């Protein structure tokens, strides 16, 4: 047996297409996909054959049935949605890698109506003329925040870039060194500022910035003071920063506008529910800040969006900036954001129906009761595992409330038959992927980020992956 002989034993594309199992497959999978997977499988075998040494050639066999099984499996894998639902058992509420905020179940009908049909996206129904897509959300944002006007773009980095490009292109913007944040993915505020065309003037030190530092940096080229809320980290100890109100007064003294990026977009005072202080959008607006930017998909609990609120004078200018077109949001984002914001008209309703707020404010006692239910379901299956309930801490995530530790209860699972790493791996690769934590040789599932309707899926997953 030599490599040439083995190559001759490989089936051709046409031979495989004429196989009965493949013919049946083409009845449910597009032919183009099947042909693609056949060609890739043949190429994979060719590469493997080329890598064989003399001793391996002797025992090498071409198993046609195995090739067909692999092709069928690969075809179905290709047709599966890559972007799909997962179960978040990590306890990190705003898990960036798992999609951050969950949209409220209560808004799906409004979003679907807009998604599946024609809509009033850019039409003025009263006048029968072209309208603005931004009018759909600007009124409710203004009502909730108390701002003069509002504009929505596709994320908060875009919001900051649009604001700076409009208000400070080729001009200077003064920013404290202690607020030069990196917002994730290696994107940094100074980089966003440079891309906008604004010139950074950094003042103070990492841990201390005084009001006089801002004043000393003012020049005839100063276009704005910028405050960036350090929502994804905290500097503790020997520190000092300038309050927003102080900076606003300084801005009025020199006729310099104040821009504040508050990041997470809190619309409810979370301290009332046992969480740490996080500045609300309403506080920034009422303090006199000229322009405030924040995210839609963090603590606000809506879709990914960058929301700009503040003085109408500046927002009107932003609407004329060509970047607004590049950064504009689609009808799905508009529909989801408007419907989410409507829930804020009743604070109790917002806390109950917006998943992010509900998860953040759920008490440890409530989570414990839910943990008992899931634990009982797992134990009743008589699986080859040791399962227990333990106290633990959840995290907020998403670059929000970095020091916050939320008391929670978790299910700890230790398998008697497979390793913890293998168990975690199998759960993650389950058809509905289950993400967990691993600690002390146990798989940890935090109930804070688990929905009751997901319990059955979790139990079924354990049944299958431990077999």
Curated annotation (Swiss-Prot):
Its EC number is 2.9.1.1. GO terms for cellular component: cytoplasm. Its cofactor is pyridoxal 5'-phosphate. InterPro entries: PyrdxlP-dep_Trfase, PyrdxlP-dep_Trfase_major, SelA-like, SelA_trans, SelA_trans_N_dom. Pathway: Aminoacyl-tRNA biosynthesis; selenocysteinyl-tRNA(Sec) biosynthesis; selenocysteinyl-tRNA(Sec) from L-seryl-tRNA(Sec) (bacterial route): step 1/1. It catalyses: L-seryl-tRNA(Sec) + selenophosphate + H(+) = L-selenocysteinyl-tRNA(Sec) + phosphate. Its main location: cytoplasm. The keyword Calcium does not apply. One of its GO terms (biological process) is conversion of seryl-tRNAsec to selenocys-tRNAsec. The modification N6-(pyridoxal phosphate)lysine is found at residue 298. One of its GO terms (molecular function) is L-seryl-tRNA(Sec) selenium transferase activity. It is an enzyme of class 2 (transferase). Converts seryl-tRNA(Sec) to selenocysteinyl-tRNA(Sec) required for selenoprotein biosynthesis. This is L-seryl-tRNA(Sec) selenium transferase. The lineage of its organism: Bacteria, Bacillati, Bacillota, Clostridia, Peptostreptococcales. The gene is selA.
């Amino acid at each position: 047996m030599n490599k040439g002989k083995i190559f001759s034993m490989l089936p051709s594309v046409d031979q495989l297409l004429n196989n009965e199992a493949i013919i049946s497959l083409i009845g449910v999978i597009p032919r183009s996909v099947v042909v693609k997977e056949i060609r890739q499988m043949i190429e994979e075998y060719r590469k493997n054959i080329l890598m064989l040494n003399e001793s391996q050639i002797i025992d090498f066999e071409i198993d046609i049935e195995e090739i067909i099984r692999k092709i069928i499996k690969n075809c179905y894998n290709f047709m599966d949605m890559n972007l799909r639902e997962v179960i978040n058992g990590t306890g990190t509420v705003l898990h960036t890698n798992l999609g951050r905020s969950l949209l409220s179940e209560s808004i799906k009908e409004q979003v679907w109506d807009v998604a599946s049909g024609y809509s009033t996206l850019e039409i003025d129904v009263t006048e029968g003329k072209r309208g603005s897509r931004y009018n759909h959300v600007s009124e409710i944002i203004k009502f909730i925040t108390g701002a003069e006007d509002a504009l929505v773009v596709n994320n908060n980095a875009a919001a900051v870039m649009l604001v700076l490009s409009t208000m400070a292109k080729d001009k200077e913007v003064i920013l404290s060194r202690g607020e030069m944040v990196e917002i994730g993915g290696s994107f940094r505020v100074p980089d966003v500022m440079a891309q906008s065309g604004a010139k950074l003037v950094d003042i103070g030190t990492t841990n201390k910035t005084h009001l006089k530092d801002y004043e000393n940096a003012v020049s005839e080229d100063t276009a704005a003071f910028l405050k960036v809320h350090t929502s994804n980290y905290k500097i503790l100890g020997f520190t000092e920063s300038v309050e927003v109100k102080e900076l606003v007064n300084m801005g009025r003294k020199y006729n310099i506008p104040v821009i504040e990026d508050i990041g997470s977009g809190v619309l409810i005072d979370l301290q009332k529910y046992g969480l740490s202080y996080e500045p609300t959008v309403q506080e920034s607006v009422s303090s006199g800040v000229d322009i405030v930017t924040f995210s839609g998909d963090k603590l606000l609990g809506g879709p990914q969006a960058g929301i700009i609120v503040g003085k109408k004078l500046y927002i009107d200018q932003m609407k004329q900036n060509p970047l607004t077109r590049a950064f504009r949001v689609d009808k799905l984002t508009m529909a989801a954001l408007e419907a989410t914001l409507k829930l804020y008209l009743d604070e109790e309703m917002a806390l109950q129906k917006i998943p992010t707020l509900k998860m953040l404010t759920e008490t440890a006692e409530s989570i414990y009761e839910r943990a008992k239910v899931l634990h009982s379901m797992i134990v009743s299956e008589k699986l080859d595992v040791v399962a227990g309930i333990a106290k633990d801490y959840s995290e907020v995530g998403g670059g929000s409330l970095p020091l916050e530790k939320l008391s929670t209860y978790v299910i700890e699972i230790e398998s008697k038959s497979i390793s913890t790493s293998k168990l975690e791996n199998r759960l993650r690769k389950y058809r509905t992927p289950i993400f967990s934590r691993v600690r002390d040789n146990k798989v940890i599932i935090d109930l804070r980020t688990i929905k009751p309707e997901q319990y059955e899926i979790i139990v079924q997953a354990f049944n299958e992956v431990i077999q």
